[in-house]
Amino acid sequence: MLSVIRVHLPSEIPIVGCELTPYVLLRRPDKTPSTDDVPESAPLEGHFLKYRWFRVQSDKKVAICSVHPSETATLQCLGCLKSKVPVAKSYHCSTKCFSDAWQHHRVLHERAASAATEGNDEEELPRLNSSGSGSGVLSTSVSLTNGSSSVYPSAITQKTGAGGETLVEVGRSKTYTPMADDICHVLKFECVVVNAETKQNVGLSCTILTSRVIPAPSPSPRRLISISGTDVTGHLDSNGRPLSMGTFTVLSYNILSDTYASSDIYSYCPTWALAWTYRRQNLLREIVKYRADIVCLQEVQNDHFEEFFLPELDKHGYQGLFKRKTNEVFIGNTNTIDGCATFFRRDRFSHVKKYEVEFNKAAQSLTEAIIPVSQKKNALNRLVKDNVALIVVLEAKFGSQAADNPGKRQLLCVANTHVNVPHELKDVKLWQVHTLLKGLEKIAASADIPMLVCGDFNTVPASAPHTLLAVGKVDPLHPDLMVDPLGILRPHSKLTHQLPLVSAYSQFAKMGGNVITEQQRRRLDPASSEPLFTNCTRDFIGTLDYIFYTADTLTVESLLELLDEESLRKDTALPSPEWSSDHIALLAEFRCMPRARRNNIL
């Protein structure tokens, strides 16, 4: 007969908005173990499984720490209460916890005071002009549901011991997504075998209790800062979103694939915050809040693209394209191959064309052309690294100043890549970047089209790949060129391109001086004008991610503010409960340049 051997949860700490899926191990009638579901609609030899979720309620109120949400709060920041910061952010579990977070509290107090002065109480992505004043970009909330589970308004009550707790039934499916009403309460999951004919329970039910439900940590909003020195507030669309004529926003974000999110590597991150069920919702909330017109994501697993990001971002008006890594050197489950995903808002752009770059194919062609037969195997082992790039040509649906006449199409080319090559293979990394740029040059030669090159290049400022991108050539004496055992970089004079690429975030260095811009400049590397970091782990901090643009066709209007290391180190490093990737998101607002101004620049 069907029976339940055991049940357990991947994480004992439930978070609001993050689906709970218990692991249920069964013994089938033939005595074999199984984890397959046996619903009432498909009973097994006259029996099926029934699930129920309960909220265990008591009269005792519990506050939880805003930094360590699995811990009970023991003290509260009075400054937060006076500043009308959301009360949940004011709690701490210890004096050390409060002391470590004090600088973060000061930022919260200052922003709350600024918001109160402007009369804006909405949760928002603030937009600041170069004088330091700002207005809000209205954010939208991510809709979270319990799938097929039901919420029952009437309580099923029963006393459970001397504490007088009450069980409130909240769901009847295998999975359950905690809601705000569950915060600070324990959840109880119950699984029992039921006779399909009599509807009576067979044997004892298996139950499991969770820890107290905690709210999803809420990162402090990052501000959008004007670079142009003009008022970028613009007009609000029907969703309350500022729009400047002829401008658009681009987000680039390595979201940290679940495949790479190992507790061995990121042992400082709580297991519940490292779990994909939590991270995917936190990442989605962050991405949606930015309301970018174009979103370039790296390290997106193909199953996560199809089953989560594509349908969820579709609800927010995005169309998505995906390029998975090639699998010539992949070993294991093909469902866990990651790649690059590019999304765009359907009301702002339409899809015209897609190009896919597979560096493995380029490596094979290169090997056939220049590598002696005796060295081909070793050459391929060095060159084949499974990386890809996704290049998308879009047509703008909004007004643009770049057109000579109102009827001309405004096209845009967006390249999205992840150059994941070991640090010591400097020749391979530079060769892949050069290969991508040569492909983009061909597209540029066929059309007068603005270009964006986004992604995680895994290369720091002043390295040969970064120099090639930003300067258009590499000095023959650059130390990176010393690593070239296959001779693929020779002659060095070929390491050039003609695209007028500029790093968007380098424009922070050119802004006029005020409190806001000085703060951002302190977060730039003075030598390269690039951010001090876009990747922050316990063992490494540095810049690996970039948004490059063609400076003869586009100008930067605004940039998403950079984060400071101190605020991230309160959780040791990234990822953390607040930020669910080991990288930070980069976002820039661009304006298409009028042709007359292009000619003056040229």
Curated annotation (Swiss-Prot):
InterPro entries, sorted: CCR4/nocturin_mRNA_transcr, Endo/exonu/phosph_ase_sf, Endo/exonuclease/phosphatase
Q: Which GO terms describe its cellular component?
A: nucleus; P-body
The protein's Enzyme Commission number: 3.1.13.4
Tell me, what is one Gene Ontology molecular-function annotation carried by this entry? poly(A)-specific ribonuclease activity
Annotated region (Disordered) at 113-136
- Where is this protein chiefly located? nucleus
EC class (word): hydrolase
Q: Where does Mg(2+) bind?
A: 299
Q: Which cofactor does it need?
A: Mg(2+)
Query: GO terms for biological process?
Result: mRNA processing; starch biosynthetic process; sucrose biosynthetic process
**Subcellular compartments:** Nucleus; Cytoplasm
Write down the chemical reaction(s) this protein catalyses: Exonucleolytic cleavage of poly(A) to 5'-AMP
* Keywords attached to this entry: Cytoplasm, Exonuclease, Hydrolase, Magnesium, Metal-binding, Nuclease, Nucleus, Repeat, RNA-binding, Transcription, Transcription regulation
Subunit relationships: Component of the CCR4-NOT complex, at least composed of CRR4 and CAF1 proteins.
Functional description taken from the UniProt entry: Acts as a catalytic component of the CCR4-NOT core complex, which in the nucleus seems to be a general transcription factor, and in the cytoplasm the major mRNA deadenylase involved in mRNA turnover.
- Family in the record: Belongs to the CCR4/nocturin family.
Q: What is this protein called?
A: Carbon catabolite repressor protein 4 homolog 1
